[in-house]
């Protein structure tokens, strides 16, 4: 049997040969080239052995060589290894010699036994056994298998520790602890001795109902005796988008699981773990181990409404499973439950897995989030819990533990792996063990003996003396017996008092402590919480104070001082010993009897590297998943750099290493290329200002690798890369070895010593060039940059073939070396040369052809770049002619004239060399200049290729153009030159386009590391996954992981509140429970309700026309207009507030509802026509403030907010506290009441008014409905404006369901209004006072309609005639309520009349138009005209300014109201000067709203202070600009109906069921995912928003059930990963009918024209475009695009609609298509779509259309603004729509422009194939002028660099080249007719004289002219 190895393609060919075709063969799992002497040299062997010392060693067991069969003799270990390495790499295995060799060696031994240990193949083993038996050996029975080797990708180094004895390194830790959302915050709690216990948070459960009264003999069912705990206040916060979780799923996921994700991610980040970066972080070698002991969330919270994610969200097995799933780890995941020791048990399992080699990295943690009150009740009833507060560890009064919450995660590796991977190490675990207290008196009690056994075990396993332990972190739950028992076991083990040699010396103190006294007992997370504390202690070198002893130390503890043991009552310094380590014992036990303990020690000290980092430029990366997180990450980095500027370990190189190689990178990216830390900070600030990284790359960029040709070499090329990069140096060394093996000159010296360059032969230089390029290729690939296509110039094409896997390295070197040697042998150096000329081939021929000069065209590099070749004399002869023709030229420094006849003598020999080469199929396309095309098949290569490559001219331009046409090259790609200088890549850019980014690999006189840094920075920000570890590999001093700021999460709260205390009633008989409801007389429907403990919103509505509410809202009539009183809003707010009390966490009886800041914004008039009139109330709950902000608005018929009338703030207040406060003010109020009553009997101005008199007194102001007349009498002091009233509700109807009847509220508040409108000093004919709301309404008890109440108020004047007063409400002597800050505004009577009647008109008449509201555009079909139509042509004579009617009317209103003549209201008139104050502003704005329908805020007159600025302001609202009138003379012309019909454009409106379906699909997606519809943009990835397989099932099921859409359940969101792709799929499923015009379907020449603007069909401007009766010009209006649809795929939506519309008019071709501007792009796309279906295109006309080779550039907003401002859109476009001259642009126009451009932005049109159904004639019509060439003001310069795009220049710059431009690339090989509309620009060519020229060109194209 023979073993044969070779490269796979070669081996395949070998096995196909006749000799081996029938041989028995099988593959071996060997994929490296072993036993290959042609590949390896002695130098390779020495490289492998370079780390092995040459130590003398004696061989104990003889080693028999597998190559010779003889015993290896070696004096040193290094020699023995050399023999082994040589046998592996260079020598053949001689199985036939092994067995005889062994037998020969042992044959002289006196009797020996043979025992087979199975380490070799059975055949070889049998041969050896047979040979030994023949030599006299005795066979022993049985077979011993070799030790089982666990698979691991870790390769231990010579100094590594055996795996089973390795220390376990803790790399990092992250956690959430009570009052500590981070590790640093946790240290703050510890070092300050903070006790974090408090009553249960309202988000957990209501302590008032769940904590029983301890004074009772027996606690109520399911209540506990304590409400204390240590809580995570931010447990609800989570970044769902980061973890691809939908807002629907996130609340259902247990907060413990969510926090485990957050902390695991933070821990991995701090550890610098990038999955897959090293062998120990391969995803299948990572395991996750978590301790968790309860399922609170799914038992209590999510179980209240079980949904799709109930199981994966709540089951604790998903805690580690979710981490594995998110990071795609495929190692084991375990959830461990051993009660209180769960997390330490998980840690134990993880350590065991590391020691056994089951995993190489372990993620370990514990979680404890308490939301189920039952667990607390059970623990309390089991006497576990303290009823007095926190864990009082070591306290004499300790009475149990306090439950605590925590989630923490740490990352572990074996120490050897961590050191090898340059990981940060915080501490090391030496040993960990677990046992059980089997002998304990109770299962829940620990056993001293068992714990002592455990401590002895871990100390022995760790090899640590008990006196070396300087600190013990106790379990320390806080019971007298438990603390005493644990302390006894610890001290007996660590600080015994006998025997004497075991006693601690004075310098060996032991400290004990427990974190539970600070943060409670974290139960399943208790162990990792203690570990977090100790890690912080090691980091801070401090033992924090113990805060558990509240009274005195537990008297049951052993005597501590006698054992040199102490409890730190204040912070104690704990420095690391010099040249030593601190060692700690941590103890953790379980209520179920388990005990776990571990030994921890300091991390090994990291040696300082003195090797400097020679790089000048360093790259610093910041990335995030969302723009918000990116911004905060940058800010955090800046703050960190400021804080750590003096840190000793902070260097720019280490910052670069940590932020690049040791971070997982996200889509939103910022990269800084800096030379100092200060420049990093400056660049980060710039990135913030410019919002860099706010948009994410749309994908990974594609690269073209360009390989330099001959002539660019220079001395020192690649020298710095050779010196600085090990991989590059190794590649060059390997190529040098191949060169020598193939008998070519060596090349390595050119990279080591640049001085050797001068003496190098052409062969050496050419070999060095291709070796350099191949090494560069491997360098880029190592860095993660791979090409999608390659191109090489001349010699560089060989390296390109290697990059494309066509040739091997050896084959490239063989061909290039042979070619060069043949040239040296057969061609004379220096006899020929080459000349680079700046010209195109045609002009060159024109210049040189007539002269008869001889030359050869060697290279066609670009449109204006060619290279000539010939003899030196030929070249010198033609140079003068070229200079006379102004063709710049340069002689190239080359020894031969390549690609000319000079090389012909070598072609036959070169072909012979090539025939021995294997050419493989290209792995990527090869853009081949040798053939001027793209090569993709193995058949494209061979010996013939090599010959033609040598002789043919280099047609670089043709090859690149071919690649462009095949879409293998475009300007969105990136290009890298692989060679000494960036030469070829410039040629690529010329064809690819100006946006094509180019990068060099090397430049003369520029450090290669700087070049590399610049390129990688660009690649990274474009989305490339750079292999940063390789980038930093050769710079060891940089490889230190810094503790950078944690990821800035984009946190939102997700919480399901436990409600209604249902846990208290488990097992009870069903009860009819009265729930707080919202519906009533003033609230008819709950639209939506998300109120909860953490916040939320509520939307309710009421129909004011409904019979139960309608009378209430017509209670006050002012000037005959029924107005709704604020009391209606108050009742709604009180109802909402009462409902919200259940979420406050307080008892409902304790809290009252306050209606604060009631602000009346506008009058609400109730209609009387019986039609529905909806009042909507929106309430937003602020959980922290316990308040709700409310707005009250009416809706229009479409359900949209029409007008907001009022707003207020609902507050929850403590009733008893408010009662106490009011009680203190009651005496003063009662005193004032008494004084008023006494004044009635004295001479003065105080009078009492009866009920009849009260309402009669204000009758001319307001008519009160009887139900609102509850004031029985008032006593009024007109001088003091003070009054008291008596209120009685016996005559007020009690019908209806209210919180507080609005009539009651209104009556109690009326006193203030009567004081202001009924005092003797008021003149109601001139002025009156209206209610503007109040500051506060508090009712301490419900209003009793059977009682009589007293009210008191005193009004005081404020500013601007606003009067306020506090109305106190008394029930007898008791104050039961107060209206604080009741506000009444003085208003002129006529203004009030305006306000009221304007409100009435808005409600009952035509509502005024709100400024800026989009207006519906009505498109009508052309009418059938039966009479002569007169058209007019207006000829310009003069222009004069004229004001818009709205402006003149507004000025007239100001004139009338102010009394100032309109003529005097000039632009510079100040409103202050003419007395326009806030009140007059209200009147003016009211009239403008009423008469003009323009909604002007009265506050505008306080901000806009002059008439001129007011006009500008008003124009902004109406969308108009200052206009000019045109004085014209009019010519009338009659047109017949036939002529009119023939000249008109028929509009087509695209409507479609598909978009309706899509809208519903969006709604389902939003509903099921919880994402707002507005966030479902086209580029949204479903995976990013958490649409997983479960949600996919739900969505697909609903689509099937509701819309009969049959979509794949499992793969829908895999096949269509973005919103845009799904929309294309959905809209493609459903039909999109179009309405087409009824134009003459029998016409001979149908054409399609695609205008971008609305065109009025009667416009004479377009008459020249009309054809004769038998010819129809049909317009298909563009698809009405909106911003929502702008990101959708073009082909699937807009294009389909065009084609459908066209084929409704004309089912089949031939078609004549035309389009103007972007419409030309659409016409081109429609043509291709029709051709694809087999339809024929007769003609295609493109009218001033930009070529869509690379999509259309976006136009900046300032372009549109400028066009509007100078009149292009207001003037030119009005000519297109003459009936609306100078009018405001349609609302749809700008969005349509922008959406069209956005639609076509990514449409890179493919070339049109040259098929039989392609257009027979292609016509391109350019506009001859430019709009900004004089007629209109030029566009001002951009304020930002890069804002002006090439696409904008198409419209803003005068065209000078009227050729086909880039359209020629889209019609390869086709002739394009070109016409120019002279004297017209882009926007005017479609009308008037432009249209006359255009019509002629169209007729010519259509063949309608003779």
Curated annotation (Swiss-Prot):
- Give the residue ranges for region: N-terminal hotdog fold: 1084-1217
List residues of the PKS/mFAS DH domain: 1084-1393
Q: Which SMART domains match?
A: PKS_AT, PKS_KS, PKS_PP
Residues carrying O-(pantetheine 4'-phosphoryl)serine? 1478, 1589
Transmembrane ranges, per UniProt, are none
Q: Where is this region: Malonyl-CoA:ACP transacylase (MAT) domain?
A: 706-1006
Residues of the region (Thioesterase (TE) domain) are 1695-1893
Query: What EC class does the entry list?
Result: transferase
Region C-terminal hotdog fold, annotated ranges: 1245-1393
Per UniProt, residues of the Carrier domain are 1441-1518, 1552-1630
Q: Extract the PROSITE patterns matched here.
A: CARRIER, KS3_1, KS3_2, PHOSPHOPANTETHEINE, PKS_MFAS_DH
Looking up SUPFAM superfamilies in the UniProt record yields: ACP-like (SSF47336), alpha/beta-Hydrolases (SSF53474), FabD/lysophospholipase-like (SSF52151), Thiolase-like (SSF53901)
**Phosphoprotein: is it a keyword of this entry?**
yes
Gene Ontology terms describing biological process: fatty acid biosynthetic process; secondary metabolite biosynthetic process
Segment Disordered: which positions? 137-158
GO MF annotation terms: 3-oxoacyl-[acyl-carrier-protein] synthase activity; fatty acid synthase activity; phosphopantetheine binding
Reaction(s) this enzyme catalyzes, per UniProt: 6 malonyl-CoA + acetyl-CoA + 6 H(+) = nor-toralactone + 6 CO2 + 7 CoA + 2 H2O
Upregulation details from the record are:
Expression is up-regulated during the late stage of P.nodorum wheat leaf infection and is controlled by the cluster specific transporter elcR.
Pfam families, alphabetically? Acyl_transf_1 (PF00698), CurL-like_PKS_C (PF22621), ketoacyl-synt (PF00109), Ketoacyl-synt_C (PF02801), PP-binding (PF00550), Thioesterase (PF00975)
PANTHER family given for it? Answer: FATTY ACID SYNTHASE, NORSOLORINIC ACID SYNTHASE STCA
What is the documented function of this protein?
Non-reducing polyketide synthase; part of the gene cluster that mediates the biosynthesis of elsinochrome C, a perelyenequinone phytotoxin structurally similar to cercosporin. The first step of elsinochrome C biosynthesis is performed by the polyketide synthase elcA which catalyzes the formation of nor-toralactone.
Question: What does the record's free text say on domains?
Answer: Multidomain protein; including a starter unit:ACP transacylase (SAT) that selects the starter unit; a ketosynthase (KS) that catalyzes repeated decarboxylative condensation to elongate the polyketide backbone; a malonyl-CoA:ACP transacylase (MAT) that selects and transfers the extender unit malonyl-CoA; a product template (PT) domain that controls the immediate cyclization regioselectivity of the reactive polyketide backbone; 2 acyl-carrier protein (ACP) domains that serve as the tether of the growing and completed polyketide via its phosphopantetheinyl arm; and a C-terminal thioesterase (TE) domain that facilitates the release of the final product from the enzyme.
Q: What name appears for this protein in its UniProt entry?
A: Non-reducing polyketide synthase elcA
Organism the protein comes from: Phaeosphaeria nodorum (strain SN15 / ATCC MYA-4574 / FGSC 10173) (Glume blotch fungus)
């Amino acid at each position: 049997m023979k073993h044969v190895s070779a490269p796979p393609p070669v081996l395949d060919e070998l096995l196909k040969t006749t000799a081996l075709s029938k041989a028995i063969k099988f593959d071996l799992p060997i994929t490296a080239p072993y036993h290959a002497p042609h590949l390896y040299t002695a130098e390779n062997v020495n490289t492998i052995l370079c780390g092995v010392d040459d130590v003398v060693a004696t061989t104990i067991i003889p080693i028999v060589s597998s190559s010779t069969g003889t015993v290896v003799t070696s004096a040193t270990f290094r020699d023995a290894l050399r023999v082994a390495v040589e046998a592996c790499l260079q020598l053949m295995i001689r199985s036939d010699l092994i067995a005889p060799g062994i037998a020969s060696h042992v044959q002289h031994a006196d009797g020996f036994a043979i025992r087979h240990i199975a380490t070799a193949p059975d055949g070889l083993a049998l041969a050896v056994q047979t040979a030994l038996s023949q030599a006299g050996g005795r066979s022993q029975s049985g077979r011993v298998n070799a030790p089982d080797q666990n698979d691991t990708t870790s390769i231990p180094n010579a100094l590594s520790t055996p795996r089973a004895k390795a220390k376990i390194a803790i790399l990092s830790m992250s956690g959430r602890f009570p009052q500590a959302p981070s590790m640093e915050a946790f240290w703050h709690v510890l070092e300050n001795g903070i006790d974090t216990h408090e009553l249960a948070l309202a988000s957990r459960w209501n302590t008032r109902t769940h904590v029983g009264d301890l004074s009772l003999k027996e606690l109520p069912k399911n209540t506990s005796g304590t409400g204390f705990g240590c809580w995570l206040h931010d447990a609800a916060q989570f970044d769902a988008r980061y973890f691809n979780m939908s807002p629907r799923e996130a609340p259902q996921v247990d907060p413990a699981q969510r926090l485990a994700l957050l902390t695991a991610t933070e821990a991995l980040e701090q550890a610098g773990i990038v999955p897959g970066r090293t062998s120990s972080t391969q995803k299948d070698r990572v395991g996750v181990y978590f301790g968790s002991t309860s399922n609170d969330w799914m038992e209590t919270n999510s179980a209240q409404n079980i949904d799709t994610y109930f199981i994966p969200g709540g089951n604790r097995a998903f805690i580690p499973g979710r981490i594995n799933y998110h990071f795609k780890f495929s190692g084991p995941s375990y959830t461990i439950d051993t009660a209180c020791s769960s997390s330490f048990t998980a840690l134990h399992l993880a350590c065991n897995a590391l020691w056994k080699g089951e995993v190489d990295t372990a993620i370990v943690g514990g979680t404890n989030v308490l939301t189920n009150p039952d667990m607390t009740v059970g623990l309390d009833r089991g006497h576990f819990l303290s009823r007095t507060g926190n864990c009082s560890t070591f306290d004499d009064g300790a009475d149990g533990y306090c439950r605590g919450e925590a989630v923490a995660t740490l990352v572990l590796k074996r120490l050897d792996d961590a050191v090898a991977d340059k990981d940060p190490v915080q501490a090391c675990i030496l040993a960990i063990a677990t046992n059980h207290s089997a002998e304990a008196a109770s299962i829940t009690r620990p056993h001293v003996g068992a714990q002592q056994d455990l401590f002895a075990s871990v100390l022995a396993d760790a090899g640590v003396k008990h006196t070396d332990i300087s600190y013990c972190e106790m379990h320390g739950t806080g019971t007298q017996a438990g603390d005493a028992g644990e302390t006894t076991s610890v001290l007996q083990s660590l600080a015994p008092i006998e025997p004497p040699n075991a006693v601690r010396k004075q310098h060996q103190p032991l400290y004990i402590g427990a974190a539970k006294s600070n943060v409670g007992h974290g139960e399943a997370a208790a162990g990792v919480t203690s570990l977090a504390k100790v890690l912080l202690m090691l980091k801070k070198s401090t033992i924090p104070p113990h805060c558990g002893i509240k009274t005195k130390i537990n008297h049951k503890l052993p005597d501590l001082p006698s054992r040199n043991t102490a409890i730190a009552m204040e912070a104690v310094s704990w420095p690391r010993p010099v040249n030593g380590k601190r060692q700690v014992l941590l103890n953790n036990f379980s209520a179920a009897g388990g005990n776990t303990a571990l030994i921890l020690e300091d991390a090994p000290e990291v040696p300082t590297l003195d090797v400097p980092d020679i790089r000048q430029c360093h790259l610093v990366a910041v990335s995030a998943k969302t723009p918000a997180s990116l911004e905060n990450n940058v800010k955090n980095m800046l703050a960190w750099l400021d804080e750590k500027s003096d840190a000793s370990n902070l260097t720019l190189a280490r910052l670069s290493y940590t932020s690049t190689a040791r971070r997982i990178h996200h889509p939103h990216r910022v990269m800084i290329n800096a030379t100092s830390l200060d420049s990093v900070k400056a660049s980060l600030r710039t990135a913030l200002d410019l919002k860099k990284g706010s948009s994410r790359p749309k994908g990974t960029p594609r690269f073209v690798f360009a390989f330099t040709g001959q002539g660019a070499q220079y001395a020192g090329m690649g020298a710095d890369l050779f010196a600085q990069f090990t991989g590059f140096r190794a590649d060059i060394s390997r190529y040098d070895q191949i060169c020598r093996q193939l008998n070519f000159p060596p090349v390595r010296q050119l990279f080591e010593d640049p001085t050797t360059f001068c003496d190098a032969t052409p062969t050496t230089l050419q070999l060095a060039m291709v070796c350099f390029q191949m090494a560069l290729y491997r360098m880029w690939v190592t860095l993660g940059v791979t090409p999608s296509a390659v191109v090489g110039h001349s010699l560089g094409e060989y390296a390109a073939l290697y990059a494309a896997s066509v040739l091997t390295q050896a084959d490239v070197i063989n061909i290039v070396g042979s070619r060069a040697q043949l040239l040296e042998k057969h061609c004379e150096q220096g006899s020929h040369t080459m000349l680079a000329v700046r010209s195109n081939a045609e002009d060159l021929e024109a210049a040189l052809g007539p002269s008869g000069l001889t030359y050869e065209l060697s290279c066609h590099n670009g449109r204006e770049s060619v290279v000539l070749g010939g003899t030196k004399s030929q070249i010198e002869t033609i140079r003068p002619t070229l200079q006379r023709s102004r063709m710049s030229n340069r002689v190239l420094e080359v020894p031969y004239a390549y690609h000319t006849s000079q090389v012909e003598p070598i072609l036959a020999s070169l072909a012979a060399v090539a025939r021995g080469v294997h050419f493989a199929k290209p792995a990527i396309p090869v853009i081949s200049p040798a053939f001027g095309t793209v090569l993709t098949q193995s058949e494209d290569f061979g010996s013939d290729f090599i010959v033609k490559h040598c002789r043919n001219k280099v047609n670089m331009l043709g090859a690149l153009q071919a690649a462009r046409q095949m879409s293998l090259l475009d300007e969105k790609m990136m290009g890298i030159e692989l060679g000494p200088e960036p030469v070829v890549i410039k040629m690529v850019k010329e064809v690819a386009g100006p946006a094509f980014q180019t990068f060099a690999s090397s430049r003369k006189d520029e450090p290669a590391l700087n070049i590399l840094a610049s390129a990688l920075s660009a690649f990274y920000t474009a989305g490339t996954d750079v292999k940063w570890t390789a980038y930093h590999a050769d710079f060891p001093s940089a490889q230190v992981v810094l503790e950078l700021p944690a990821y800035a999460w984009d946190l939102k709260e997700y919480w399901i509140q436990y409600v209604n205390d249902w846990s208290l009633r488990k097992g009870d008989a069903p009860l009819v429970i009265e729930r707080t409801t919202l519906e009533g007389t003033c609230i008819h429907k709950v639209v939506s309700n998300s109120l909860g403990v953490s916040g939320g919103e509520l939307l309710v509505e009421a129909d004011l026309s409904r019979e139960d509410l309608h009378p209430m809202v017509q209670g006050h009539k002012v000037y005959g207009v029924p107005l709704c009183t604020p009391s209606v809003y108050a009742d709604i707010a009180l109802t909402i507030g009462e409902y919200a009390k259940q979420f406050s966490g307080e008892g409902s009886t304790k809290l009252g509802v306050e209606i604060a800041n009631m602000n009346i914004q506008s009058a609400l008039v109730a209609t009387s026509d019986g039609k529905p009139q909806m009042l909507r109330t929106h309430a937003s709950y602020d959980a922290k403030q316990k308040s709700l902000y409310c707005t009250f608005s009416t809706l229009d018929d479409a359900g949209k907010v029409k007008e907001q009338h009022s707003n207020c703030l609902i507050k929850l207040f403590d009733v008893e506290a408010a009662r106490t406060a009011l009680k203190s003010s009651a005496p003063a109020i009662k005193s004032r009441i008494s004084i008023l009553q006494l004044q009635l009997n004295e001479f003065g101005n105080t009078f009492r008014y009866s009920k009849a008199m009260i309402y009669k007194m204000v009758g001319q102001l307001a008519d009160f409905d009887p139900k609102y007349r509850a004031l029985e009498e008032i006593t009024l002091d007109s001088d003091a404006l003070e009054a008291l009233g008596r209120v009685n509700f016996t005559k007020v109807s009690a019908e209806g369901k209210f919180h507080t009847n609005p009539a009651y509220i209104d009556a109690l508040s009326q006193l203030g209004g009567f004081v202001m409108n009924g005092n003797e000093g008021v003149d109601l004919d001139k002025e009156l006072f209206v209610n503007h709301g109040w500051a506060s309404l508090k009712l301490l008890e419900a209003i009793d309609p059977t009682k009589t109440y007293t009210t008191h108020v005193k009004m005081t004047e404020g500013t601007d005639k606003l009067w306020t007063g506090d109305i106190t409400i008394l029930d007898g002597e008791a104050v039961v309520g107060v209206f604080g800050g009741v506000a009444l505004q003085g208003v002129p009577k006529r203004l009030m009349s305006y306000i009221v009647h304007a409100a009435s008109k808005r409600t009952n008449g035509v509502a005024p138009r709100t400024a800026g509201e989009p207006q519906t555009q009505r498109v009508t079909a052309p009418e059938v005209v039966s009479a002569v139509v007169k058209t007019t042509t207006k000829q310009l004579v003069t222009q004069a300014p004229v004001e818009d009617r709205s402006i003149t009317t507004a000025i007239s209103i100001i004139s009338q109201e102010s009394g100032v003549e309109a003529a005097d209201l000039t632009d510079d008139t100040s409103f202050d000067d003419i007395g326009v104050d806030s009140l007059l502003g209200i009147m003016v704005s009211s009239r403008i709203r009423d008469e003009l329908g323009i909604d002007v805020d009265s506050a505008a007159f306080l901000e806009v202070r002059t008439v001129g600025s007011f006009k500008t302001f008003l124009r902004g609202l109406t969308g108009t600009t200052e206009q000019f009138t045109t004085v014209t003379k009019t010519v009338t012309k009659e047109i017949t109906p036939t002529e009119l019909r023939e000249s008109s454009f028929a509009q087509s409106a695209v409507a479609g069921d598909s978009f309706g379906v899509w809208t519903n699909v969006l709604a389902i997606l939003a509903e099921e995912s919880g994402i707002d519809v507005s966030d479902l943009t086209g580029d949204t990835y479903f995976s990013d928003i958490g649409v997983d397989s479960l949600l996919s099932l739900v969505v697909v099921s609903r689509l099937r059930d509701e819309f009969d859409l049959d979509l794949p359940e499992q793969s829908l969101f895999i096949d269509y990963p973005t919103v845009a792709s799904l929309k294309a799929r959905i809209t493609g499923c459903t039909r999109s009918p179009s309405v087409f015009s009824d134009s003459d379907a029998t016409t001979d020449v149908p054409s399609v024209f695609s205008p971008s603007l609305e065109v009025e069909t009667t416009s004479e401007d377009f008459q020249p475009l009309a054809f004769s009766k038998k010819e129809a010009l049909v317009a298909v209006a563009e698809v009405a695009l909106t911003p929502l649809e702008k990101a959708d795929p073009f082909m699937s939506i807009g294009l389909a609609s065009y084609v459908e519309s066209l084929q409704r008019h004309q089912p089949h071709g031939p078609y004549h298509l035309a389009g103007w501007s972007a419409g030309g792009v659409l016409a081109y796309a429609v043509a291709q779509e029709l051709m694809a279906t087999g339809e024929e295109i007769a003609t295609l006309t493109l009218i001033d259309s930009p070529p869509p080779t690379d999509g259309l550039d976006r136009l900046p907003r300032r372009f549109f603004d400028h066009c509007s401002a100078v009149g292009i859109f207001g003037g030119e476009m009005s000519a297109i729509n003459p009936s609306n001259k100078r009018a405001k642009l349609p609302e749809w126009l700008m969005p349509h422009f922008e959406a069209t451009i956005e639609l076509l932005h990514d449409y890179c049109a493919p070339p049109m194939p040259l098929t039989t159904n392609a257009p027979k004639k292609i016509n391109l019509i350019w506009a001859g002028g430019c709009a900004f060439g004089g007629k209109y003001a030029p566009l001002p310069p951009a304020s930002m660099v890069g804002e002006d795009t090439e696409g904008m220049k198409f419209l803003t710059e005068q065209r000078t080249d009227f050729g086909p431009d880039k359209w020629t690339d889209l019609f390869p090989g086709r002739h394009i007719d070109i016409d120019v509309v002279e004297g017209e620009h882009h926007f005017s060519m479609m009308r008037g004289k432009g249209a006359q020229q255009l019509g002629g060109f169209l007729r010519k194209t259509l063949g309608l002219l003779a």
